[in-house]
């Protein structure tokens, strides 16, 4: 019997990068060598957001996923995981692409933190102005 075909994909969000390895299996998802529930501290809404491309296509139990995520915080990492999963699932089965694209999961979210400008406290916050 031939070994299961592995597909790699990369997803990004803010400063986070997620590398996903997907292959046919039983639905086991690991993130940085931990179960996804342990890595995302059992927060159901965040876990559901991360695996939305799989639940949209109803294939949560058909593929094993091994993810490596670096950089950023929780929101960025979840967005990067979602982006990587969407790309990987489209590479493994091209017929899934229209449904995933329609939901916007293949589009890299371009929003980044705005840089701090000199003379200001933050990116846009200046010093308080007193008229008198």
UniProtKB/Swiss-Prot annotation:
GO cellular component, one term: cytosolic small ribosomal subunit
GO terms of biological process kind: translation
Keyword match Ribonucleoprotein: yes
Gene3D superfamilies the record matches: 3.30.230.10
Pfam families: Ribosomal_S9
Keywords of the record: Ribonucleoprotein, Ribosomal protein
Molecular functions (GO terms): RNA binding; structural constituent of ribosome
Top-level division of the source organism's lineage: Bacteria
Family: Belongs to the universal ribosomal protein uS9 family.
Protein name, as recorded: Small ribosomal subunit protein uS9
Naturally occurring in which organism (per UniProt): Leptospira interrogans serogroup Icterohaemorrhagiae serovar Lai (strain 56601)
